[in-house]
Amino acid sequence: MNDYIVVKCGGSMLDQLNDVFFDCIKKLQQQYKVVIVHGGGPEIDAKLKDCNINVEKRDGLRVTPKEVMDVVQMVLCGSTNKKLVMNLQKHNLLAVGCSGCDGNLLQVQPVSGEIGYVGEVSYVETALLKGLINMNYIPVIAPVGINDNEIYNINADTAAAGIAAALSAKELILITDVDGILHEGKLVKKTDESEIATFIEKGVITGGMIPKVQAALASLKMGVQKISIVNGTKDFTEDTGGCIGTTVTRGVSIV
């Protein structure tokens, strides 16, 4: 059991996770070293609304001035992270919640002054993750990072990709509420960058699936070898250790 698997669960999925999801994590943990990265978009939006703070996004990234960063940190590092940790432990999966600023886990470079405290992963302190895993804990990571003693918001997809690349993970699994990419009603089991571009152009991939495949493509560019888009509300694991869903790699034809 030497290979790492990184599981990214978006904020919109956290309230949909059921016993099947946690059973899948148990099965993955029997064969791999598992790290979980979560988002928290809907809860952040709700809290900002409660605080009468405007929600603004540019090119898929949350505009994060200081007052927004305070809320992001409170939600991601607090309630969202701890709910997921407690849910894992309710299902007999030992977990430790931490953020990217704990132990300098995720160091970042600012994306742009125009969008405030938003960073891209520049360094991952993998020793911390490996230490937790060696003690049989699942690290559950809130996607904030640190630069020059300031905390930055990180897009959860890019945080997960950065961690997967740093760990040379065998796979990055993106948890969604659909079975994967569908073409003419059938699941596309394997695809690559060029085919995804064609699918988007032809309207095969639309709506909420577009940001998911864009996250997969960005992950490939960061060095992740394989990304699986799976339905977290169903059993997405195979007995062989693979995933049931759409697998995105470099230069692979559709099967």
Curated annotation (Swiss-Prot):
Endpoints of the signal sequence: none
Positions annotated to bind substrate: 40-41, 62, 153
Entries under Pfam families matching the protein: AA_kinase
GO biological process: arginine biosynthetic process via ornithine; L-arginine biosynthetic process
Coiled coil: none
One cellular component term from this protein's GO annotations in UniProt: cytoplasm
Alphabetically ordered keywords of this record: Amino-acid biosynthesis, Arginine biosynthesis, ATP-binding, Cytoplasm, Kinase, Nucleotide-binding, Transferase
Gene Ontology MF terms: acetylglutamate kinase activity; ATP binding
InterPro entries listed in its UniProt record: AceGlu_kinase-like_sf, AcgluKinase_fam, ArgB, Asp/Glu/Uridylate_kinase
Residues with site note (Transition state stabilizer): 8, 212
Reaction(s) catalysed by this chain's protein: N-acetyl-L-glutamate + ATP = N-acetyl-L-glutamyl 5-phosphate + ADP
Principal location class: cytoplasm
Pathway: Amino-acid biosynthesis; L-arginine biosynthesis; N(2)-acetyl-L-ornithine from L-glutamate: step 2/4
The protein's Enzyme Commission number: 2.7.2.8
Localization per Swiss-Prot or TrEMBL: Cytoplasm
Keyword ATP-binding in annotation: yes
Enzyme class name: transferase
Family to which this protein belongs: Belongs to the acetylglutamate kinase family. ArgB subfamily.
NCBIfam families according to UniProt: argB
Purpose: Catalyzes the ATP-dependent phosphorylation of N-acetyl-L-glutamate.
Name assigned to this protein: Acetylglutamate kinase
